[in-house]
Each structure stands twice: as C-alpha cells, then as structure tokens.
Amino acid sequence: MKRTVISSSNAYASKRSRLDIEHDFEQYHSLNKKYYPRPITRTGANQFNNKSRAKPMEIVEKLQKKQKTSFENVSTVMHWFRNDLRLYDNVGLYKSVALFQQLRQKNAKAKLYAVYVINEDDWRAHMDSGWKLMFIMGALKNLQQSLAELHIPLLLWEFHTPKSTLSNSKEFVEFFKEKCMNVSSGTGTIITANIEYQTDELYRDIRLLENEDHRLQLKYYHDSCIVAPGLITTDRGTNYSVFTPWYKKWVLYVNNYKKSTSEICHLHIIEPLKYNETFELKPFQYSLPDEFLQYIPKSKWCLPDVSEEAALSRLKDFLGTKSSKYNNEKDMLYLGGTSGLSVYVTTGRISTRLIVNQAFQSCNGQIMSKALKDNSSTQNFIKEVAWRDFYRHCMCNWPYTSMGMPYRLDTLDIKWENNPVAFEKWCTGNTGIPIVDAIMRKLLYTGYINNRSRMITASFLSKNLLIDWRWGERWFMKHLIDGDSSSNVGGWGFCSSTGIDAQPYFRVFNMDIQAKKYDPQMIFVKQWVPELISSENKRPENYPKPLVDLKHSRERALKVYKDAM
C-alpha cells in the first residue's frame, strides 16, 4: 500500500511547523473492505426503490410500535448519548428524565444514568476525522461536568473485539446488554436514545430492538431534525427528491406546529435537580489513539470551545452582529461570514430547534418570504438548517446513499479517469489552480472550509479531474471537523451531478469566475498559497503548473457525462 508524505511550505503553517505527515491515499478509493467485504450493488440499491427490501428506518418504526413501557422489575433508566452531546433541548434525555421520575414513584431506589459508547471500528469505517473526534472527547468531558451538577453519572464504555467489528453486529448487542446488566445488577433497564439516520446506525438499533431479553427496553426518538423524516411527502405520499417544493412544505409544517408567537419549535428542557441521591464523579480513562491524530499538525490542535455555553454564545453573536450580512458574506472565502455553528450542530452541542427559534425572532414572524428570492439573510440562514433536514430525510428514504452509492444509479456508468496522482495533488492543494489549492490547504491545516469552498473543490475534482466524487467525499469526512455524512453525501452528489436535486451535468464551475467573485483581491489565495504573494502575472517557479486546462477538461467532462447519462 502506497504511503505518501504530505509536505507544505505554507506560510501560515511555517510559523508553527511544517506539515510532514505520512498519509495513505488509497484508503479513499473505495469502501473499507475490512468492514464492507460485500458492498451493496446497483441491484441491491434498487431493492430499496422497488420495495423488495425494507428500508431500515421503516423497520425501526415498525419495531418501535411493538414496544410497550413497563416499570415492572426495572431499577435503572439510562440515556445513551450519540450525536446529541447536550443537556438543553435534548428529546431523548428529556424523555429519560420523565421516565425516571415515573419510575421513582414506584421504586424509590431507582437510578438515572447516561452513557456514551466508543467503538473505534465505527470511526475507522465511517472515516470520522481526528478534528471531530478531538472535539467530541472534549465535549464529553464538559458534558460529564454538566451532568455531575445534576447528579447524573456519565459512563464511557469501550467496545473492542479481537476482530474489527462494527456496532451493527450481534457482538455489540451482547456487549451492550452485558454492560447494562452490570449497571442495573441484572434488573430491568430502560434506555433512551436519539435516532441516527445512517444505515449502519439504524441496523445497529434494529438489532437491539430485536433483542429478546425483556430486561432491556429501548426507546428511540427523533431529535436531530426540525421535522422528523417521513412527515413531509408529496401529494402521492412519496418522498421529495427536489429541495424547493420540499422546503415550502417544511415551512408550512413548522408554521402549523408553531409553539407561540415568539417560539416556532417546542424545546425540551429538563429541570436543574439532583436526580440521584448519591453521586461520584469518575474521570474518563480513555485517550484517542495516535492513528486518529497523525495527519493533523500538532501545532494546530487548537479547537473551538467545546462547551454548550460557547455554542449558545456563538449563536447569539451571529444573530446579533452578523446574520444581517449573511446573504452577502456567507460565500466569501476571505471573510468569516458563516455562523461557525456547524461543529456544534454536527456533534449535537446545540439543537437546530433552538437555532431556528432564535433566528425566528429576527424574522418578524416569517421564516420564509413569499418569493424565495426575497428571503432575508436570516431567512436564508434558516433555509440552510432546512437543507440539513432535507438530506437526512433523503438518506432515510434512499438508504443506499449512506452505503457508498449515488442517488442517481445511472451515474454508476460514468467512466471516471481516477488518476491517483491527480487525486493526491487535489488533496494536498497542489493542482496549480490557486483557488482550489488555497481551499484544500486550509482544510488540511484547520479542519474547516465553508460551503462555497466545498462546492468549488468538489466540482473541480468530479468534473475537471474526472475523479469519482466518492474519493473526495471520503477525504472530506476524514478531514472536516464538522463532517456530517448526510450533508456531505448530499453536497457531493449536488456538485458531481450524481445526487439528489443535483445541478445539471453540464454545469461545471469556472474556477476563474469563482475566484474573482468570492476572493476578488486574492486575500484568501495569498494567505494559503504564499508562493503567489509576490507574483504579478507570472507563475512562480515554485508553484505547480495546472493539472488540467480548465476549458478542455470541461469539454471532456461534458462528453463523459453525456455518454453515461
């Protein structure tokens, strides 16, 4: 297996350290065969479409309906934290507290716990980034302190097996059951958790729901979407595959269930009580292995504040000082025109319901204008939250999109060039196209780029370089601090014309126009490509020649796409 050293003389980084890190680029070329030895095929994907195979979300809902809550012989209630690492407005945690309070009326010795489960194989298989994992570990420590004030212990369980094993396995079910029984001394336990919509995670929950040990009662809740998947359908009862009509119905649905004139979403707030009479805070004994951090420059291990308070503060600051300029500044590469909330949303440090509630108060009671083109900056900010819901709804309806397959199965016929050298140069910001290189270097050094940056580089990889969009999708997941699988797959599908509500195949971003529009003074480019600082019209000798001619590569892409589609 080829391993390449990433080297950069980036001026931004050189003040601290060079980025000289061994990296295996081949891991991005396909799904990890260790975890997915038999990846889904086109035929298998179509089984979801023709209803010959049940969708995992439908199975979860069907099994849930069979569940009945019983407090008989139950001594413990436990909330299983996943991507919902917060106390404020957490549906599953709120339900857990409510169930515990009911149980306490029957069993005065009942206990309330919280748990987070680590499976490093899940991280490897899903290519979770070291940036994000560092943030999560910091958030867990902060969450443990916050829960301690409520006398709720946060347990940290590590799932390991001799073989590489995902959590959607019978081994995990046995592990989870044993851990729960250890906590409850063999008596009944009620576990609450918020649903994760990726296929692997849904199959994990299906296995747990199918577990026949009646001492375990699992209660799953919708939490990460403003509107739960399945509630917004066409007049024929099918799922939307185009955003705009879906978005209009989303707005209608949210307005119909508006809580009050000042709040549009119902929030789930737990009381600040001491829930267990006795409590002992036990520090976590887990540290992230080096393998998850080795491609991140140590000098850049400077993460955003991981606390819930920091997320709330960012939201307040954005709505108070920046949201009015969102339409004009969100795409600019050299400005911080976005909210900076994405990592907090991805890890669940803040709920999207709270975000929409706060933003709603700045919209004069209207979260969408009659004509979308007239949306205010804050209304368009809310629209971005809706996009996140949309991609989650779509992933539930077309599960194969989280299994390494495109929404448009006909695009599997595209004859990608898949030049591994070109891919490495794209990854490391050495394509010879300044705007692309600046964006990719920033991603390497910071773990974050804005949405416009993602669109520019995704279009260049899939159209100009004719490299399978899934290579880039995996690279982004491995390097983004806010990597979210449904949004990442959705965004790459849009730019590569292979996904849901994608741009037409003949739309290829013009890199020169993108640079002039979103970095007109080359402030961003010169920050991240210092080779160009002193150059005027000449290409410096220490800066690579363009990998492709933009005009000719566009023409090539149009032909290849047209032949396949």
Give residue ranges: language-model regions:
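Active-site-proximal binding-pocket segments
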Residues: 340-526
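Trp/Phe/Arg-rich N-terminal binding region typifying the photolyase-homology
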Residues: 2-258, 263, 441, 487, ...
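Charge-dense, low-complexity intrinsically disordered segments
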Residues: 126, 130, 134, 302-305, ...
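Long, contiguous hydrophobic alpha-helical segments, chiefly transmembrane helices and signal peptides
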Residues: 79-81, 116, 136, 140-143, ...
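Short, loop-centered acidic/histidine patches that primarily coordinate divalent metals
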Residues: 196, 497, 531-533
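Alpha-helical packing segments of well-folded alpha/beta enzyme cores
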Residues: 92, 139, 143, 311-318, ...
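Glycine/tryptophan-enriched, flexible segments
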Residues: 8-36, 72-73, 237-410, 519-565
